[in-house]
């Protein structure tokens, strides 16, 4: 069977702060530049016909950062959602969020929900932002939901595949395909509590390029390498 581009790309956007430091600028400037690349990479994936793109924007661990930086990131996110809405509408891009947004302030939550609603029928590409997201937290929340619906008697009658299907149906990503390709910029070689369940069979790509410097040519090279890899999913050729 002829190899094809991934259906679902996930990106750990790492290196904004280090990029800013190298430029002699504040970390906040690095985040601003990173937001521009979010727009670009979404457009590049749409041009390639890739249906789903998930971007790790703010993790459950990022609250440990200095309050001034966290506050800036929240304001930057709200501004991004407002400023980019015409782009989503014009390019028929659907916007979705995974993660626990209940802790965000009302204005930010409303901006997220408004853009999700406005773009819910768009079909060109679905862009998913992972916000206040951690894979362990997601799985724990899923188990809590299931615990309210399953009795010991019901559980005893289920096969492991039944349980896997139930978990899939209750994750934040319930209606999304598994991740085929996971990219991390910034040089680190770990996946940092990101989509541990969904990326079980993903092809991993690590680059030393800091996220604000990540470009179309590098993405294209990764996509070409993806086409060359043999994905056997535990089987044989």
Swiss-Prot record:
Cofactor binding annotation: Binds 2 magnesium ions per subunit.
Binding site for Mg(2+): 14, 203
Enzyme Commission number, as recorded: 2.5.1.-
Single GO cellular component term: cytosol
Family from the record: Belongs to the UPP synthase family.
UniProt source species: Helicobacter hepaticus (strain ATCC 51449 / 3B1)
Domain of life: Bacteria
SUPFAM superfamilies reported in the protein's UniProt record: Undecaprenyl diphosphate synthase
Record InterPro entries: UPP_synth-like, UPP_synth-like_CS, UPP_synth-like_sf
Record's keyword terms, sorted: Magnesium, Metal-binding, Transferase
Protein name (database record): Isoprenyl transferase
Cofactor(s) essential for the protein: Mg(2+)
Binding site for substrate: 15-19, 27, 31, 59-61, 63, 65, 184, 190-192
Keyword field contains DNA-binding: no
